[in-house]
Structure formats: C-alpha cells, structure tokens
Amino acid sequence: MEEYQVYLELDISRQQHLLYPLIFREYIYGLVYGHDFNGSIFLENLDYDNKSSLLIVKRLITRMDQQNHLIISANDSKKNQFLSYNKNLYSQIISEGFAIVVEIPLSLQLNSSSEESKIIKYYKNLRSIHSIFPFFEDKLTYLNYVSDARIPYPIHLXXXXXXXXXXXXXXPLFHLLRLFFYEYCNWNNLITPKKSISTFSKSNLRVFLFLYNFYVCQYESIFLFLRNKSSHLRLTSFIVLFERIYFYGKIEHFLEVFAKDFSSTFFKELFIHYVRYQEKYILASKNASLLMNKWKNYLIRLWQYHFDVWSQPRTIQINQFSEGSFRLLGYFSNVRLNRSAVRSQMLENSFLIEIVMKKLETIVPIIPLIRSLAKAKFCNVLGHPISKPVWADSSDFYIIDRFLQICRNLSHYYNGSSKKKSLYRVKYILRLSCIKTLARKHKSTVRAFLKRLGSEKLLEEFFTEEEEILSLVFQRVSSTLQGLYRGRVWYLDIIFSNDLVNHE
C-alpha cells in the first residue's frame, strides 16, 4: 500500500473518488507483479514474469487509451483490433489492474485509523478452519434450532460490479468493468452453483474473487447489528477468511447498516450464532422456531429485492438439533442427547432421576467421500479400490509417498470425527489402491506382488504411523488425556480443505 500511496495522492486529489484514470496508469500494472501481490502462498504463480515486461505494459496502455479500440458493437466484436493481440495475457493483466484499482478506496478507508490498522494486521494471520468445531462444542449444545443454507450466487456479475462501483462512486469505472467482462469473459462460466468460489480456475482471477467477496460482504452486513442488538452475544464474528486473502478488513468497515429501520422488539433477547465458510453458512438460535422462520423470510426478501437474486424458501432448512444434522467443512454434525439414570435416595425413599446431556457429534460422510475418491480414480463408485495408472510410470518411492501423504492429510483432517470406522475404510481404499498401482507398474498380480514385497511394513506405514507419533505425545500424560486422544482431536493448523474433503 505504501508503494503507490504517492501516486494515489496525485490522481485522487484532483477529483474525489474518480478511479477511472488509474486504469490507464502504467505503474498500476507494474504493481500487479510486485512482490506484495505475488508473495502469497495460497495463489499459484501465473508465470507471466517474462511476458509482463515494461514494453508490453506500455503497449497495453497505449491500446487502452485509443478510444476507437474500445468502441465495440455486436457485429464488430470479432474484428476488434484490441482482440487481435494476446487475449489471455491482456485479460489477466487488465483484470489484475482492475482488482488493485477497486481495492484502493477500501484500503484507504481502512488505513485512515490506527484501530483499523490493527484489524488488518490481525487478519493477516489466518485462523484454522477447524477452530469452528470447538466453538460449536461450546455453543451449539445450548441452542435449539439450526438453519443450514448457502448464500445464493448472483445471477449476473454485473450486479456485483454495480454494487462495488456504487460504493466507490465511479461510474466510468463500472462501465469499463462491464466492457471488460463482455469482451474477455464468458459470463455463464464465471460463477456457477456447482463450483465453489474458492475453486476458481487460473483464468478467473483476483477481480472476480473481489467482486464476489464484496457481494458476500453486503449480505453479511445484516448480522452486524444482530450482534450489537443481542443482550447475550457480544462476540467477535467467527468467520474464516481464507478466500479473502486480498480483502483489507472486516465487514464492519464496509457497509453502514440501518438498524433504525428494524423494530427493537424483533430482536428482543436474541441469542443467535452465525458461522460461514465459503458460500455455506450455519445460523443457530436458542429462540423459538417462529423467530427462525421470520429470519428465513427476511433473508429471502433481502436477496430478492436488494441483490436481485431469487432463492427458493425450501433451500433454507430449519431443523431442531435433536432431529437433524448439518454439513460443514466435510463433516456431518448433529447434537445427540445422552440420557442416563441416576439413583437418588432420601431417608427411606429412593427414586431414579433421568439426566439428559447434549453432545456434539461430528461424523465422516463416507458416501460423499467415496464419491470424491472415485472422482480422483482411487476407487470405483461402489468403493472398490482400483489402481492409479497415471502414477504407474513413477518410482516405487514416489507412489508410496503420494499415497501416504494423501492418507495422512485425510487422517489429519478427519481426526475430529466421533466415529473412526469410516476413516479406517478410507485408509483401506487408499492402501489397496497403492498396492494395485505398484502391482500394475511391476506387471504383476496383487497377491504375487505382496508375497514378493511383504505387506506388513506397508500396512504399518498406512495404519500406525500417526498413532505411533501421537502415542509418544500422550505416553506420559494421564489416562484421562489418553482417552481424549482416542476420541477425537482437532488440529488447529488446517487453514483450507483439499479437493477430496471439499465434496459439498
């Protein structure tokens, strides 16, 4: 931010909130490939360092400055001289430049106060996504109803671009964004319900993530005054911000919420929790189902009238914890009632007292997980292991190491499961798939290969490696902690889910 602060003062001081001229500034595109923007460990390098030379950027700016290249009609779009050059390269350079420009007013707002600077520094350290589950264990057992739903995708990115342009108060920038989307992008493939926003391909870059995150941010603004109105809930919003790598702050500093438009009685003694990961969110409350249905209707109308997004009421499910479950982060979760009887005696009379305790259960969804393994060619749709022919040309060490790494990652991720039987089945599929891949490479049968190699060591690596490591950690602790280890352990170093886990 400090690198281009001087340039911004020169451009913005003349015309307030006019971001359109920044699109044609050469230093903006130079900053696109600066170390501050390509240093993230989460985004892959696009390998444009050799192509994004200063000469190419100058040519790009020159072509953008020529108005006759930007006048496009329906009949002449294919003949446009601007499109006769490297379309993919230019589209990526321009989209990255757009992303920097539209983030400028937001970053300037957040850098204006020391308190907001602390927020920026805080969210650079990403929180583990598995820290959501200890939060569930502490809070959800005291609640009654849960709403399991998805934030609907915008029908058209023009609506998301219009919202960002309205906040930035730069109409020319909005029209240029629309022109860019029209020429370079297939609108129908940018955001689809079948794919998560975090699984964008390399061609869908930072500007689309920014627009979608801005759209989600506007939706989540409704929950800001929920937290302030509640007499019970005074917690910091518990939201994982993995997909907001380039977002400069929290939603409190994005949008003003008009809390005065809502009656105070509607939020009287509100006890509600909201958790979101990507487009999936969980809304849990202790109040009666009538209030939850009111919020369901309100959210549907909010999407319909404010975001021009139609959402069917049946897509938002409201269930009691004791009767239903919800899916989040690759787990099936529900609240189970544990009933136990305690005998009590007073004088000569004795009687039984029934004690009901709530416990959060997290279960590995074996059917969706097998479907993910089948998609990755580790087994068929019935869960029968098959060989991985793509790796058959690699060395034995490489094949075993790849399978062990996948097995460790899944075991690491699903170690918080209440029941380990499904996890052991997944390990069995991966182990047998590894053996079949090695047998395929050596042109042998599975039985002959195991007889020649010896299966015991291979089996031990798959099944006992993690257990041996953890047993060293817990060998000197009490039996109570050892029982806790045998139950479930949440690893708080997991900051994203891989493709096998992300089967929702």
Swiss-Prot record:
UniProt KW tRNA processing keyword: yes
Cellular component GO terms held in the UniProt record: chloroplast
Any Gene Ontology biological process: tRNA processing
InterPro entries on file: Domain_X, Maturase_MatK, Maturase_MatK_N
Alphabetized GO MF terms: RNA binding
The entry's keywords: Chloroplast, mRNA processing, Plastid, RNA-binding, tRNA processing
Superkingdom in the source lineage: Eukaryota
Record localization: Plastid, Chloroplast
Family, per entry: Belongs to the intron maturase 2 family. MatK subfamily.
General function of this protein: Usually encoded in the trnK tRNA gene intron. Probably assists in splicing its own and other chloroplast group II introns.
Name by which UniProt lists this protein: Maturase K
Source organism of the structure: Lupinus argenteus
Name of the gene encoding the protein in the UniProt record: matK
